[in-house]
């Protein structure tokens, strides 16, 4: 669902017609089912709108950095989508190191993440939309599942749905978004 939400944010920003728009995806490690679902959701949503996924890179942020720099030179894109927090931070670092952002003028960044750094750059306008997983709730769900397994001696694990918010610069300071971004302060 998070991937589909990113695709919808891109479609909304570009008027649902992405024909001819070139997209690059930083897909994180695809060994986790949740990451596979994010990738499937975003790539299907973009293709249905006419966008061309020029390339996608799989792996952890540090391991794909060199490949990204090469691809960015050989196959520049109009839209960058980072499916994980570290990958979104890597893109922000990439933009920051570029003579004050000529790439920002021709490339829109969308990502998943909740770090202070990503929220700061969303507020600054470098990230167009950030999908923010409710990590506080995710931790609660995990502890609840562990407690039930210990109490009832269950061996099975099941998937849980993680809630998330789609945040753009305009709505960053809305009360419901602030509760998710800064749960301890509340």
Go through each PLM region and give its residues.
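Hydrophobic alpha-helical segments within soluble ligand-binding/sensing domains
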Residues: 1-20, 65, 113-118, 133-151
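Sec-exported extracytoplasmic/periplasmic mature domains
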Residues: 8-16, 43, 47, 69-76, ...
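Hinge/cleft segment of the Venus flytrap/periplasmic-binding protein
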Residues: 134-186
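Short beta-strand elements in bilobed, periplasmic/extracellular small-molecule ligand-binding domains
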Residues: 23-25, 42-62
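Short, solvent-exposed amphipathic alpha-helices that sit
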Residues: 2-6, 33-51, 90, 94
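Hydrophobic alpha-helical
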Residues: 42, 59-119
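Short beta-strand segments enriched in small/hydrophobic residues
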Residues: 21-31
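Loop/turn elements at helix/coil->beta-strand transitions in domains of secreted/extracellular proteins
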Residues: 19-22, 47-53, 75-79, 104-108, ...
């Amino acid at each position: 669902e998070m991937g589909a939400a990113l695709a919808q944010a891109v479609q909304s920003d570009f008027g649902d017609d992405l024909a001819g728009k070139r997209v690059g995806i930083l897909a994180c490690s695809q060994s986790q089912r949740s990451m596979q679902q994010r990738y499937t959701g975003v790539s299907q949503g973009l293709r249905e709108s006419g966008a061309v996924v020029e390339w996608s890179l799989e792996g952890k942020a540090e391991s794909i950095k060199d490949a990204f720099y090469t691809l960015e030179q050989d196959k520049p894109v109009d839209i960058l989508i980072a499916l994980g927090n570290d990958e979104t931070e890597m893109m922000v670092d990439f933009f920051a190191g570029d003579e004050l952002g000529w790439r920002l003028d021709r490339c829109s960044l969308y990502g998943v993440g909740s770090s202070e750094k990503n929220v700061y750059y969303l507020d600054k306008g470098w990230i167009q939309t950030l999908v923010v997983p409710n990590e506080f709730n995710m931790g609660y769900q995990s502890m609840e599942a562990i407690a039930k397994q210990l109490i009832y001696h269950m061996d099975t694990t099941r998937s849980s749905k993680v809630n998330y918010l789609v945040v753009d610069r305009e709505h960053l300071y809305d009360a419901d978004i602030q509760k998710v971004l800064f749960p301890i302060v509340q």
